[in-house]
Structures are given as structure tokens and as C-alpha cells.
Amino acid sequence: MSIKILVSAVPLVAAALFAHGESLSGPQPCISVGDTSVQIANLPGQAALHVSFTDDPALATVRVQIAETAEGADFAVVDDAGNSEGGACAANAATRLVAISAGATGNAPVIYLSAEGPADYRIFVRSQAFTAREAAALVVGAGDGHHRLTAASL
């Protein structure tokens, strides 16, 4: 009897953990642009903007180049625990949530991320909290997927 209860409880516990995964996963990558925050969504259904990535530059709607230096980038993410802007990316009513999708959907931006070639945005990422893909998604999300970003902060 106790084994049956345990076996039936395991899927319920797993479902509960999955449903509340955002509280267990910690803060998601986020940037502030003016009065707006742009954050990677915990769950794709939460996001107003979905972006995807392609390895084919001909399929891209936005090109993001990985810069070799922070000076050569429009946007830089560098982990620096001693120089963090506390609350710079606090979630608020104006927070835009961005999800990274496995494939292109509708009019959603398709990002070509590369170290070479022409680019709409240039990013520099040296971080344990952000990946280059997440930084690219946030920068594109900050520009509504179509416009160049002027200034952002962590």
C-alpha cells in the first residue's frame, strides 16, 4: 500500500516542482533600458516576445555579432560582483518578457549570432549569469526585435 502511495505521489511532486520552477531557478537574465526592464521569461507562455536563433544568415531578421572587446560592443555583460547596480533590473509593470523559442514563429525575430559579418547589434559577454544567446535575445527584445538599442544597463 505504501509503495502505491509513493508511486502515485512522485508524479504530483514532479508536476508541482515544474509548475513552480520559476521560484527554484533563481533570477533570470535581465537588462534595464530607460524605465523598462527586459527579462528572459521563466516560462515561454509568459513572454510577449519570442525570439529564435538560426545558423543561416539568410533566414535571420536580426544579426547580432559577438564582439571581442567591450569597447567594440553596443551592449556588454561582464560579471563584476563589486560593481553591481542594485535593483537596476527590478521587475515592474513595464518589464518585457522575452522567450527563446526552438524555431521561428510568425513575425518573431530570428537572430543570427556570429563573431563575424555585418550586424544590427554587437554584444560582448563575459558572464556566469548570461549566455551570449540570452544577451542577444535581451538586446533584440529591448529594441522590440527591430530597432537599434541606444543604452542599457544591468
Q: Each predicted region: which residue ranges?
A:
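Bacterial N-terminal signal peptides
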Residues: 8-16
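Sec/Tat signal peptide C-region and signal peptidase I cleavage site
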Residues: 17-21
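Repetitive, compositionally biased segments used for assembly/scaffolding
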Residues: 23-154
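Bacterial N-terminal signal peptides that target proteins for export
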Residues: 1-8
